[in-house]
């Protein structure tokens, strides 16, 4: 098999050249030098065309300024948000825009988040996506941005819940993320199936009171009712300290616990290994698909995890901010529930593949879905 020149391969991949005369000429043209030169010319033409406008065009969309969007996050280095960053960058590439700025705090420090938000406003951001983990801390900041004509959407967290009712606290345009209280209720339903009749259980949470995880705990506890004694154990906002805090509690209550669960990606991925290290075989589950969570579902160490699609939480805000800007504000971004899929050993198969959508690889690749019937429950909600 003839070796393909790197420049030729780059042109084919970058320009997505399908099978046809151009592709055949590049792969088997009149010699390596001419093929390489042609590939270089194609890449140069593409680069020149893209840079001649502030923002390049996709399909029949008009040329736009190079809109710079900003994402403000509460745990910027957390592995859960790796696919979120891939999603925002992929959407920007699709629309011919620069990669959004990823900023905020790496351990849920509100002052660092508001500082990052204000920096985006001062920079004249074309739009801001905010993980609003508080219903009060961001109110004036979001209002200020909106008053300056900067559209703001929230993702992953949208304020807090009080007695099961949302307290949003900002005049953002829309929320892109999971319905957090409802997802907690779903967790409660799973727990009741696994631990029938009640008893002592623990639910680990990184930091009590924050809008991204507290609603899940509250929803789960409400669904469980009085027959369960539910311990809420905070393990810390930084993933490096979570396993030790978790192990200490499990060890101290090993004889009485009937189940162990978690409301975030970090605690969930550490839960399986901690149970295994202590020789504990009790019902367990949590949220998301990071780290060892999927292998632990496969092995049966964890019974379930609830998936919320972090890739969409990066992709959709960029798309919505783009459409809002390009339409003159006519295309108002809609609230978007990114999902509540309960993953168990019986349906974990599709989540095993390495992909950008799960944050497990940087490779941009098409993943063929399984052939056959699409198994989905009967729809029960609608807008």
Where are these regions (language model features)?
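Bacterial lipoprotein signal-peptidase II cleavage site
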Residues: 47-54
């Amino acid at each position: 098999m003839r070796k393909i020149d790197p420049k030729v391969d780059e042109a084919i991949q970058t320009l997505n050249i399908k099978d046809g005369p151009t592709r055949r000429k590049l792969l088997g043209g009149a010699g390596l030098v001419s093929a390489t030169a042609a590939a270089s010319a194609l890449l140069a033409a593409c680069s020149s065309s893209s840079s001649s406008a502030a923002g390049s065009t996709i399909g029949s969309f008009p040329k736009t300024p190079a809109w710079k969007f900003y994402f403000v996050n509460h745990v910027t280095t957390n592995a859960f948000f790796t696919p979120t960053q891939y999603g925002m960058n992929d959407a920007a590439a699709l629309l011919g825009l620069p990669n959004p700025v990823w900023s905020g705090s790496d351990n849920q420090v509100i002052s660092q988040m508001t500082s990052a938000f204000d920096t985006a406003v001062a920079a004249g951001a074309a739009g801001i996506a905010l993980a609003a983990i508080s219903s009060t801390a961001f109110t004036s900041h979001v209002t200020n941005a909106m008053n300056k004509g900067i559209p703001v959407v929230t993702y992953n967290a949208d304020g807090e819940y009080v007695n099961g009712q949302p307290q949003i606290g900002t005049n953002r345009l829309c929320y892109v993320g999971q319905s957090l209280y409802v997802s907690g209720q779903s967790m409660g339903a799973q727990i009741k199936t696994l631990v029938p009749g009640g008893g002592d259980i623990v639910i680990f949470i990184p930091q009590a009171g924050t809008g991204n995880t507290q609603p899940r705990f509250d929803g789960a506890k409400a669904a469980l009712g009085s027959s369960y004694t539910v311990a809420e154990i905070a393990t810390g906002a930084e993933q490096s300290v979570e396993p030790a805090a978790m192990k200490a509690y499990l060890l101290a209550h090993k004889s009485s616990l009937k189940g162990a669960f978690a409301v975030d990606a970090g605690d969930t991925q550490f839960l399986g290994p901690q149970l295994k290290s202590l020789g504990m075989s009790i019902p367990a589950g949590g949220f998301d698909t990071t780290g060892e969570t999927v292998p632990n579902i496969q092995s049966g160490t964890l019974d379930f995890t609830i998936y919320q699609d972090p890739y969409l939480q990066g992709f959709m805000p960029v798309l919505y901010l783009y459409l809002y800007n390009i339409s003159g504000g006519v295309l108002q971004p809609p609230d978007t529930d990114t999902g509540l899929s309960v993953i168990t050993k019986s349906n974990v198969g599709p989540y095993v593949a390495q992909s950008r959508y799960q944050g497990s690889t940087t490779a941009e690749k098409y993943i063929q879905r399984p052939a056959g019937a699409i198994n989905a429950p009967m729809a029960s909600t609608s807008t």
